[in-house]
């Protein structure tokens, strides 16, 4: 038996060696062919681009120029040349697509601010922005804002200074609101899809002032608070997206939330928006040291019921009712 096993092992040995002898030369030929033909292919490409036999040509510069030509060719497919930093010109059909997609996403995913940003610009029609421009031109503060074009950032507002202001000032109220809601004026998205530079700035100004509206009305950034402020903006400024939000956004809320909005906050927002001064004309940066109560009176803004308090009271009431129900259920359940 031992002899038979040795014979079998020695019989298979040449076959394995033969296979290994075939595989190794094939692998070597493949590697050598790749080097030769790959090099020839690269040489052919370089010859086609004219990068051989001329040591005086800056090939890196030529490659950069070719890239620039491709970018220009792509830019020529746009509806116009960009008119300001960050401008993305769109054709009409692209604007319609932007409106449809952002509108759909905003309705089903309102928690994603990017959808709201896109919908805002998609619905910011030139006629609306021109009307807002005329509103600003008719007011001395509005004209100054258009002329100076301030940019609202934490650096400009000096947040450390706001934290030390008297507690009755609007600046301190604004600072505390930012801190409580954990937001910053630096997080506002830039305007990209509005073509006219002045219109783009006006919409940027509207967007950057949004948090001031929250702070002066003591409205949180939860969904009910956002809908309320959008309704205020729609009534006061005629912002199309804000009007749409005030009408459609409540449809996806819980019954108790819709009831609060329809009975309390939306009527307040519409009434206040129609009666107060155009908020786009307020130079908020210059109002930070004013008494907040006096500023509200000057702007004809009345405070709504505290939304945070109402939500807490309802949560406490629901917790109390649940506790009573569970207690009664345990009492009536036989041991």
UniProtKB/Swiss-Prot annotation:
EC number: 4.1.1.130
Residues the entry annotates as binding Zn(2+): 210-211, 214, 226
GO cellular component: extrinsic component of mitochondrial inner membrane
Pfam families: Coq4
Subcellular location: Mitochondrion inner membrane
InterPro entries registered for this protein in UniProt: Coq4, Coq4_euk
Keywords tagged on the record: Lyase, Membrane, Metal-binding, Mitochondrion, Mitochondrion inner membrane, Transit peptide, Ubiquinone biosynthesis, Zinc
Cofactor: Zn(2+)
Keyword Phosphoprotein found: no
GO biological process per UniProt: ubiquinone biosynthetic process
Reactions it catalyzes: 4-hydroxy-3-methoxy-5-(all-trans-hexaprenyl)benzoate + H(+) = 2-methoxy-6-(all-trans-hexaprenyl)phenol + CO2
Topology term for the membrane: Peripheral membrane protein
Domain of life: Eukaryota
Pathway involvement of the protein, from the record: Cofactor biosynthesis; ubiquinone biosynthesis
Transit peptide: 1-10
Parts of the chain that traverse the membrane: none
Family: Belongs to the COQ4 family.
Subunit organization: Component of a multi-subunit COQ enzyme complex, composed of at least COQ3, COQ4, COQ5, COQ6, COQ7 and COQ9. Interacts with COQ3.
Function: Lyase that catalyzes the C1-decarboxylation of 4-hydroxy-3-methoxy-5-(all-trans-hexaprenyl)benzoic acid into 2-methoxy-6-(all-trans-hexaprenyl)phenol during ubiquinone biosynthesis.
HAMAP family according to UniProt: Coq4 (MF_03111)
Protein name: Ubiquinone biosynthesis protein COQ4, mitochondrial
Species of the source: Saccharomyces cerevisiae (strain YJM789) (Baker's yeast)
Name of the gene: COQ4
